Amino acid sequence: MKYIGAHVSASGGVDQAVIRAHEIKATAFALFTKNQRQWQAAPLSTEVIDRFKAACEQYAYTSAQILPHDSYLINLGHPDAEALEKSRIAFIDEMARCQQLGLSLLNFHPGSHLKQIEEADCLARIAESINIALAETDGVTAVIENTAGQGSNLGFRFEHLAAIIDGVEDKSRVGVCIDTCHAFAGGYDLRTEADCEATFAEFDRIVGFRYLRGMHLNDAKSAFASRVDRHHSLGEGNIGKTAFSYIMKDARFDGIPMILETINPDIWADEIAWLKSEAQC
């Protein structure tokens, strides 16, 4: 079973994200549980939590179909001790919010060394940050997203993801989300079926499909191996539709939320319908 949706707005309350997902006939969705560009947010009230859970029940979304994303401000590998602590506190809050909402996944960008510490040191800090957050929360899996490798962001090589996982003590509560645009920009080709075979074989060898907890399905405005993160609508970018058809037909991608973050929300319903049709072929 393929779970397909988009990252929908939670404007007006997290329960509104559920309704917006239903309106585009999504069978999965992503959301921010707080303002993604602010460090702090008001705690979730019992009323807000109850409305969200009721909406999920009404529209038949389980936690396996929902991939919340954390704040863009958080850097779990920050080289500065004070800034690192601030990020860790914010990440624990994000995990706790997911736990309160009955959600079992939290997607996040791993972190950046800011050209101040070695890659290995940054990756170790990220793993330690995850360990701290897992110890403070229950039932939520930390889902590391691969990056395009812009600036000093780590996570653009599968080896980075594997190194972080290696440092996480509770392997049952860590996973990865593969963003197709980020992978392509990071140097993993997806333009042909043969490219997809090679890229996902490498992913399986280095990380392992057992850790795959979600996908971000995005075409790329950016060039192959450019280390530039620019999303595009499916079939309109430099990846093309072949990769997305391949993913829809491959059972290794069953049972996880697959989320559009493509640039035109007006055609998300059409993109979802096309992906569903490919999954049926």
Curated annotation (Swiss-Prot):
| Known cofactor(s) | Zn(2+)
Task: Tell me the keywords, alphabetical order.
Answer: DNA damage, DNA repair, Endonuclease, Hydrolase, Metal-binding, Nuclease, Zinc
Return the PROSITE patterns for the record. AP_NUCLEASE_F2_1, AP_NUCLEASE_F2_2, AP_NUCLEASE_F2_3, AP_NUCLEASE_F2_4
Under catalytic activity, the entry for this protein gives: Endonucleolytic cleavage to 5'-phosphooligonucleotide end-products
Q: Which residues bind Zn(2+) 3?
A: H182, D229, H231
Give a GO molecular function annotation for the protein.
Answer: zinc ion binding
User: Which major enzyme category is it?
Assistant: hydrolase
Q: Does the keyword RNA-binding apply?
A: no
Can you supply a Gene Ontology BP term from the record?
Answer: base-excision repair
The entry's free-text remark on the cofactor is:
Binds 3 Zn(2+) ions.
Chain positions recorded as Zn(2+) 1 binding sites: H69, H109, E145
Which residues are listed for Zn(2+) 2 binding in this entry? E145, D179, H216, E261
Q: What is its EC number?
A: 3.1.21.2
Domain of life, per lineage = Bacteria
Q: So what family is this one in? A: Belongs to the AP endonuclease 2 family.
Q: Which HAMAP family match?
A: Nfo
Please give the function described in this protein's UniProt entry: Endonuclease IV plays a role in DNA repair. It cleaves phosphodiester bonds at apurinic or apyrimidinic (AP) sites, generating a 3'-hydroxyl group and a 5'-terminal sugar phosphate.
UniProt xrefs under PANTHER family: APURINIC-APYRIMIDINIC ENDONUCLEASE, ENDONUCLEASE IV ENDODEOXYRIBONUCLEASE IV
Q: What is this protein called?
A: Probable endonuclease 4
Q: Which organism is it from?
A: Pectobacterium carotovorum subsp. carotovorum (strain PC1)
Q: What is the lineage of its organism?
A: Bacteria, Pseudomonadati, Pseudomonadota, Gammaproteobacteria, Enterobacterales
